[in-house]
Amino acid sequence: MANVLDELLDRGYIKQFTHEEETRKLLENEKVTFYIGFDPTADSLHVGHFIAMMFMAHMQRAGHRPIALLGGGTAMVGDPSGKTDMRKMLTKEQIQHNVDSIKKQMERFIDFSDDKALIVNNADWLLDLNYVDFLREVGVHFSVNRMLSAECFKQRLEKGLSFLEFNYMLMQGYDFYVLNQKYGCKMELGGDDQWSNMIAGVELVRRKAQGDAMAMTCTLLTNSQGQKMGKTVGGALWLDADKVSPFDFYQYWRNVDDADVEKCLALLTFLPMDEVRRLGALEGAEINGAKKILAFEVTKLVHGEEEAKKAEEAANALFSGGADMSNVPTVTIAKEDLGSTVLDIIAKTKIVPSKKEGRRLIEQGGLSINGEKIIDLTRTLNEDDFEDGSALIKRGKKNYNKIEIQ
């Protein structure tokens, strides 16, 4: 069996190991069952999760078995890692809705047929735990002194860390133990912000089960300045087409900085690394060709080849006049809406996520209709704006929508 570790290292996925040599030997000699956890705090995954799923997909293609662990139980507590304040508490119903939505998205990326991968929910074992038994069986293996020194708790101690959240590390560690016992899971993969929690899980399995347990962290998706990627004018870059249209998703990758093209191709596509390096080395106008390939490949993986082609054609239509404009994301309004302010209409049709965001966009000169920059918040949308049957809205530099009258 080929060792996928070399491929993962070459592509830049891996940030840290708990046991590097043991991990290499295990991946060389066994079909390894591993897991990545996803807390269902929203009803869609975003691009930060996508890099983790690509990590899983590379492992699966090399013959290993992924478990996608949905945190229906841990979401009841909330992960304090990387947060300065306590997360908003979700109801059981909200969490279950999110779990169901995320399951559907995951099936686009990972092959769950014939036991090749599993989706499990930690609510199945966490919600019925006896607290005293849990403390005796699991809590005894955790040192409070060590927990307090963990990076995920440090930044919260001054602001206040609830006892509810303090339990999160124990619960995540217990997840690994349950998966180890039930499915023979020997490895956890996760974002680098989960390092402290992952170490806790590895140590718990090694102490309690006396077996192999190890962890690898995946690099976070950051740009060349070290800032997290995946933020848009409307917020997170969601993988749900109802939250971020395939066209806007395509445009995000089409417009990444030149310095980030090679990294994104390596982490977010299956293109061979020789091709990734060739594309990443292009300069000047040629790098735009590499960006188009990046945008198409990532959109194809997330939304399917048909939607990727539509997004590509729409972009060509807008920027070179060479294709069908029908693929530009389109919203409709009633004739009675004519005469309303542009601000009201773009908020009502969800072209912008909120009226506040629309106001900010107009005040900063980032909105135009049919090429006319909108600078007046009271500017109305009128029949004259629909001379060609539709009005073309431009947000920022390269985000477009069409408005049509029903």
From Swiss-Prot:
ATP binds at residue 231. One of its GO terms (molecular function) is RNA binding. Keywords: Aminoacyl-tRNA synthetase, ATP-binding, Cytoplasm, Ligase, Nucleotide-binding, Protein biosynthesis, RNA-binding. It is an enzyme of class 6 (ligase). PROSITE patterns: AA_TRNA_LIGASE_I, S4. Residues 340-404 form the S4 RNA-binding domain. One of its GO terms (cellular component) is cytosol. It is found in: Cytoplasm. L-tyrosine binds at residues 35, 168, 172. A motif ('HIGH' region) lies at residues 40-49. InterPro entries: aa-tRNA-synth_I_CS, aa-tRNA-synth_Ic, Rossmann-like_a/b/a_fold, S4_RNA-bd_sf, SYY-like_C, Tyr-tRNA-ligase, Tyr-tRNA-ligase_bac-type, Tyr-tRNA-ligase_bac_1. It comes from the Bacteria. It holds the Pfam family SYY_C-terminal. It catalyses: tRNA(Tyr) + L-tyrosine + ATP = L-tyrosyl-tRNA(Tyr) + AMP + diphosphate + H(+). Its main location: cytoplasm. Belongs to the class-I aminoacyl-tRNA synthetase family. TyrS type 1 subfamily. Homodimer. This is Tyrosine--tRNA ligase. The gene is tyrS.
